[in-house]
Amino acid sequence: MSLAQFRARFQRWLFRVGGPEPAPIRLGQRRIFVLPSRFGLALGITLLAMLLASINYTLSLGFALTFLIGGVAWISIHHAFRNLVDLAITPGRSDAVFCGSPARFGILLHNAAHRSRLGLVLFPTQAPTLRTHPFDLSPESTATQEIAIPTATRGWLTLPRLTLETRHPLGLIRAWSLFQPDQRCLVYPAPEADAPPLPLGDDSRSGAGAQGRGRDDFA
């Protein structure tokens, strides 16, 4: 088994995404992952230093400030998780394109809860630079987000694995989920640039195709 195959199997086991999934895709508790962001890690190191200093110098106010900030950070984990849980995803519209033009896939996100979902970002897992602008979902609403995938070959293009993430509310925690809607787009061959003109009619042929340049179609 090659390293790439092992990595693909490990990711399928870890993220529970083995290929295109039937709609609707529901983001349950087991599909959401939570880790601190770089800012969250920096804050954690700072809080650890504050705690050690408070212990060393017996600072009551230092303890209070450390645990107060730590409690706020802990609560942000809960809010980041709730921002994604129970969302439903279904594939939207994807029109055919010519090779070389980006294929645009519509993704429908359904929020059945009575609370808003804030600061969401959607992007292809293997291409984070193609991320959407941060967007919100109103309570009991459906929103459409568009993912543009570059095309290099003609034929059917399958929508790759996507990542939906949030860093709401404080940017300390990154919560995300991976999924792959069963959606594809037809990519036509690109038209030839500066193509030669079509050949003129041949007078030696009979029938309707025998008309050459300058012949009238009507008597």
What label would you give each PLM region?
Residues 1-87:
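Extracellular/lumenal glycan-associated context and N-glycosylation machinery
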Residues 3-7, 70-219:
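An amphipathic, basic-hydrophobic helix/alpha-beta surface used to engage anionic
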